[in-house]
Swiss-Prot record:
This is Na(+)-translocating NADH-quinone reductase subunit F. It catalyses: a ubiquinone + n Na(+)(in) + NADH + H(+) = a ubiquinol + n Na(+)(out) + NAD(+). It is an enzyme of class 7 (translocase). Residues 130-269 form the FAD-binding FR-type domain. The keyword Flavoprotein applies. It is found in: Cell inner membrane. It holds the Pfam family Fer2. It comes from Pseudomonas paraeruginosa (strain DSM 24068 / PA7). Residues 35-127 form the 2Fe-2S ferredoxin-type domain. The chain crosses the membrane at residues 6-26. Composed of six subunits; NqrA, NqrB, NqrC, NqrD, NqrE and NqrF. Binds 1 [2Fe-2S] cluster. GO terms for biological process: sodium ion transport. The keyword Cell inner membrane applies. The gene is nqrF.
């Protein structure tokens, strides 16, 4: 009798387990997509892809690269596209990025949209001009205390067909990087010692993608050049250092870097209006690209000025290049302002924050600042201060162009 009860108990337990397994398998079949699905793009292109991933990564795996400054984190909203059919309901992580009208039109963040079934989507046509390269580090020196000038050499015969002010995406592999291994030139090591920057370690377990504005202009062929600032944790915080910038600061000549692009929206308007460029920090990159393009490639006769803010002379770079441009082009002037000049600078030039310097030394006496076009890229506080100052002067928002990536 006891043996029968044991056998019955084992049988019932086995039946329950098998029943639960069956339920899980049925649920998995309904909730987790498998097999292949078809993605129709712009009614002209078709991809057959495995189901189960996110739309952004699925497209990238098939050489259709949407911009994603945050690397698919759902924060930058650069990877937006229109899902005509097959994307399911918009997720809460997407809602804040779209108006109600856009939501009704099918706008989605591709990094948040699951690929579960056949889909129809629309993307900008220029996406099909985006390419992927494996580039080689040509040089990576400091140009300021916390800014590197990274120059990447493209494969032989390759070029990036970009417009001044454009950007590309860099791919950073999983890594462990120790700041003590960074190659920092002697003239910049003082602040690294002062803030004990050498103690940081960057540990990254998955591939990271970030967007960076290019510092070169279209006629500087065969290379892509960037000004990249190290993203160190705020003092007293337990936050990790920047994943991509830590990896970039450790790059040496000969290292390989995967690049996607080009992308961009921060382009110069094709008008005859006066151009005023305002920059700070690593926001130098798109400023250089634009100004060199206007004066060297386009031979523009538009009135152009550049206002750049740095803490001290050690933090200012490309100064000789701008001096030469100014000497060669009577329609161009540039102005460097230092917010904290050091005794060794022997500085007799402009001082203060760049938005105040620009206002006091130029715009307050300008006959029509509202007729100018303003192009800016710098730290967030600088951008906000400049935008407020320009708005107070009556400049329309359409004439204030901002690059959020470079600073």
């Amino acid at each position: 009798m006891i043996g029968f009860e044991i056998f019955l108990a084992i049988g019932m337990f086995t039946a329950i387990v098998l029943g639960l397994v069956a339920i899980i398998l049925v649920a998995r079949a309904k909730l987790v997509s498998s097999g292949d699905v078809t993605i129709q793009i712009n009614g002209e292109h078709s991809l057959t892809v495995p189901a189960g991933g996110k739309l952004l990564q699925t497209l990238a795996a098939n050489n259709v690269f949407l911009s994603s400054a945050c690397g698919g984190g759902g924060t930058c909203a650069q990877c937006k596209c229109v899902v005509v059919d097959g994307g399911g309901e918009m997720l809460p992580t997407e809602e804040s990025h779209f108006t109600r009208r856009q939501a009704k039109e099918g706008w989605r963040l591709s990094c948040q949209t699951p690929v579960k079934q056949d889909m129809q989507i629309r993307v900008p046509e220029e996406v099909f001009g985006v390419k992927k390269w494996e580039c080689t580090v040509e040089s990576n020196p400091n140009v300021a205390t916390f800014i590197k000038e990274l120059t990447l050499r493209l494969p032989d015969g390759e070029s990036v067909d970009f417009r001044a002010g454009g950007y590309v995406q860099l791919e950073c592999p999983p890594h462990v990087v120790e700041y003590k291994d960074f190659d920092i030139q002697p003239e910049y090591r003082g602040d690294w010692d002062k803030f004990n920057m050498w103690r940081y370690v960057s540990k990254v377990d998955e591939t990271v993608i970030r967007a960076y504005s290019m510092a070169n202009y279209p006629e500087e062929k065969g290379v892509v050049k960037f000004n990249i600032r190290i993203a160190s944790p705020p003092p007293g915080s337990d936050l990790p250092p920047g994943q991509m910038s830590s990896w970039v600061f450790n790059l040496k000549p000969g290292d390989k870097v995967t690049v996607y692009g080009p992308f961009g929206e921060f382009f110069a308007k094709d008008t005859e209006a006066e151009m005023v460029f305002i920059g700070g920090g690593a926001g130098m990159a798109p400023m250089r690209s634009h100004i060199f393009d206007q004066l060297r490639r386009l031979r523009s006769t538009r009135k152009i000025s550049f206002w750049y803010g740095a803490r001290s002379l050690r933090e200012a770079f490309y100064t000789e290049e701008y001096d030469q441009l100014q000497a060669e082009n009577p329609n161009f002037q540039w102005h460097l302002a230092l917010s904290d000049p050091q005794p060794e600078d022997n500085w007799t030039g402009l001082t203060g924050f760049i938005h105040n310097v620009l206002f006091e030394n130029y715009l307050k006496d300008h006959p029509a600042p509202e007729d100018c076009e303003f192009y800016m890229c710098g730290p967030p506080m600088m951008n906000a201060a400049v935008i407020k100052m320009l708005t107070d002067l009556g400049v329309e928002r359409e004439n204030i162009l901002l690059d959020d990536f470079g600073g």
